[in-house]
Every structure is written in C-alpha cells, then in structure tokens.
C-alpha cells in the first residue's frame, strides 16, 4: 500500500502479482474511494488524526476481504503512520520501496 498523492496497491498471491487489482478505486466510506480518502488532499483537509483513522480502517478492510499474510505501507505519507497502529502483519517501509517494488514487478514480467 502506497500513501502519497492517492493510495496505491499491489496484491501478490504465492509470489505472483495479481494484475488489475485496482483496490484504491473501490468504494470505501461515505461514497468515496480508498484513493480519495487516503490521498494527500484528504490528509491536509481532514487533518492528520482523521486521516490516520481512515488509513487504519482501510488496512482493516483490506485484511477483511483479502486476509493478507502481510502488508507493507510506504509512500511519502507513510511517515505519518506507525506500524504499531496496524498490528503484527504490517510493516512501514521507506518511500523508495514503492519505486523498487515497481521495478521488481517489471522484472517479474520478463
């Protein structure tokens, strides 16, 4: 999960990317998508406390319908959350992890 201008996601199962899983475009709360409510504009307009609460709810929602083994949270706005907020399956990763992950996905497709 990448927290930045919006919310980016990539889902892997058994080490393989599940393509076209645009989770951030799915409805989330009050008629808004994950992308809208977790993006930078929402962080600025809603305030950090409400935005963090929405991030925690989003991670729980993703776990409810994906039942993930682990989730990596990165991006420019990941610095505003703590892994403690999400439990043992969550890891906060540096902003560069999203770029490196994208490169890795590109390599996997070859």
Spell out what each predicted region is:
Residues 3, 11-110:
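ATP-binding/phosphotransfer module of carbohydrate and carboxylate kinases, centering on a glycine-rich
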């Amino acid at each position: 999960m990448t927290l930045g201008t919006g919310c980016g996601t990539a889902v892997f199962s058994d080490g393989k990317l599940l393509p076209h899983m645009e989770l951030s475009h799915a409805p989330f709360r009050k008629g808004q998508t994950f992308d809208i409510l977790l993006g930078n504009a929402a962080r600025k307009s809603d305030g950090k406390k409400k935005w963090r609460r929405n991030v925690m709810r989003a991670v729980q929602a993703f776990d409810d319908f994906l039942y993930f083994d682990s989730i990596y949270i990165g991006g420019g706005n990941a610095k505003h959350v703590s892994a403690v907020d999400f439990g043992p399956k969550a890891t906060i990763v540096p902003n560069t992890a999203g770029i490196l992950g994208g490169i890795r996905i590109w390599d996997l497709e070859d």
